[in-house]
Amino acid sequence: MREIVHIQAGQCGNQIGAKFWEVISDEHGIDPTGTYHGDSDLQLDRISVYYNEATGGKYVPRAILVDLEPGTMDSVRSGPFGQIFRPDNFVFGQSGAGNNWAKGHYTEGAELVDSVLDVVRKEAESCDCLQGFQLTHSLGGGTGSGMGTLLISKIREEYPDRIMNTFSVVPSPKVSDTVVEPYNATLSVHQLVENTDETYCIDNEALYDICFRTLKLTTPTYGDLNHLVSATMSGVTTCLRFPGQLNADLRKLAVNMVPFPRLHFFMPGFAPLTSRGSQQYRALTVPELTQQVFDAKNMMAACDPRHGRYLTVAAVFRGRMSMKEVDEQMLNVQNKNSSYFVEWIPNNVKTAVCDIPPRGLKMAVTFIGNSTAIQELFKRISEQFTAMFRRKAFLHWYTGEGMDEMEFTEAESNMNDLVSEYQQYQDATAEEEEDFNEEAEEEA
């Protein structure tokens, strides 16, 4: 079967990673000891994508937990599903990265990276046919961003033909841990542009706004934000974990979603939005779900899709519903908002339906959009980066670990290039292409 090896790095990565395993274990009927107690063959049909079947019929996540300090991993180990993970797959240092990208990427992280790669090899060897890797991490800290991107490039070297997929939490001043987040995030994006095939941008700004505005939580905690993240991660991996036709593996998803190699930053969305522990009173209809999931308020990246255009879209509907109605509603959205979809990629909206809904909901839909509006997120980070960098504020923490200012300048310009590329395709029309071809013919 086509397996995926999951890696979680740093505090944020381990917290959202642990939530992800709680949610999908529940969906597949697997309890905290790794024993199956499910009620449907669909749950086991593709279980081997994310789980290894060990002796005694126990299912063990193909997960590797990495951090430069023991704290977060101790709390994962003592958390609700802490005993399900393979004990050898906890790899941690003692020093911490102190929210410093350079420590994660060049010094402390570089010392630990070989022991992580040993575990990665061991997991990859037990796979029948490895399709790729997924990493959960944040871009604002030191370990997830610095060491996370180091791991990506090392794994890329060793497994160049496997898909690399990340769930990357983008920092925001509204939920900020550290003042140097813009530096860490820019240095990380510089790596992600080159070394990943698909990156889901999970934006703390958007998560905060959803909790505050939609769910009416006055002081959202990380627990509330992570509840949204785990619902989204469960949704975007549905096609990988349950039987179905569309985007059934990471490579097919990449082929459908990524028209140009650098533009692989996706905006996830989810509907209906519910707060932790709440029950849904009435099932939404398919038209309501479709309308909600295309709404800017339901996006997990703080970008307004109406400020850009969609290059490609994938939607995953979950629960028992009429396929015909789903197709009609999706066509309806495209016809009514045709200006928001680039016309030079016909049929750029794909829909999948899975019978098993998430826990506590009758129906739900997850949205994956490759929209040029994602440039707003990169612009936001870039502005914060430039404000500090032009005064060389806090730079000594990075140069002290052996980094050069040049690397900052390169990362800054790479991110600005990315923004211009998105803008270029936002402005491109099908007609321009024809003019372009005519010019080429004249020159020839």
UniProtKB/Swiss-Prot annotation:
A motif (MREI motif) lies at residues 1-4. GO terms for molecular function: GTP binding; GTPase activity; metal ion binding; structural constituent of cytoskeleton. Its main location: cytoplasm. The modification 5-glutamyl polyglutamate is found at residue 438. Some glutamate residues at the C-terminus are polyglycylated, resulting in polyglycine chains on the gamma-carboxyl group. Glycylation is mainly limited to tubulin incorporated into axonemes (cilia and flagella) whereas glutamylation is prevalent in neuronal cells, centrioles, axonemes, and the mitotic spindle. Both modifications can coexist on the same protein on adjacent residues, and lowering polyglycylation levels increases polyglutamylation, and reciprocally. The precise function of polyglycylation is still unclear. Some glutamate residues at the C-terminus are polyglutamylated, resulting in polyglutamate chains on the gamma-carboxyl group. Polyglutamylation plays a key role in microtubule severing by spastin (SPAST). SPAST preferentially recognizes and acts on microtubules decorated with short polyglutamate tails: severing activity by SPAST increases as the number of glutamates per tubulin rises from one to eight, but decreases beyond this glutamylation threshold. SMART domains: Tubulin, Tubulin_C. CDD domains: beta_tubulin (cd02187). Keywords: Cytoplasm, Cytoskeleton, GTP-binding, Isopeptide bond, Magnesium, Metal-binding, Microtubule, Nucleotide-binding. It comes from the Eukaryota. PROSITE patterns: TUBULIN, TUBULIN_B_AUTOREG. GO terms for cellular component: cytoplasm; microtubule. GO terms for biological process: microtubule cytoskeleton organization; mitotic cell cycle. GTP binds at residues 11, 69, 138, 142-144, 204, 226. Residues 421-444 are annotated as: Disordered. Residues 429-444 have a biased composition (Acidic residues). It is found in: Cytoplasm, Cytoskeleton. Its cofactor is Mg(2+). Mg(2+) binds at residue 69. Tubulin is the major constituent of microtubules, a cylinder consisting of laterally associated linear protofilaments composed of alpha- and beta-tubulin heterodimers. Microtubules grow by the addition of GTP-tubulin dimers to the microtubule end, where a stabilizing cap forms. Below the cap, tubulin dimers are in GDP-bound state, owing to GTPase activity of alpha-tubulin. Dimer of alpha and beta chains. A typical microtubule is a hollow water-filled tube with an outer diameter of 25 nm and an inner diameter of 15 nM. Alpha-beta heterodimers associate head-to-tail to form protofilaments running lengthwise along the microtubule wall with the beta-tubulin subunit facing the microtubule plus end conferring a structural polarity. Microtubules usually have 13 protofilaments but different protofilament numbers can be found in some organisms and specialized cells. The MREI motif is common among all beta-tubulin isoforms and may be critical for tubulin autoregulation. PANTHER family: TUBULIN (PTHR11588). Belongs to the tubulin family. This is Tubulin beta chain.
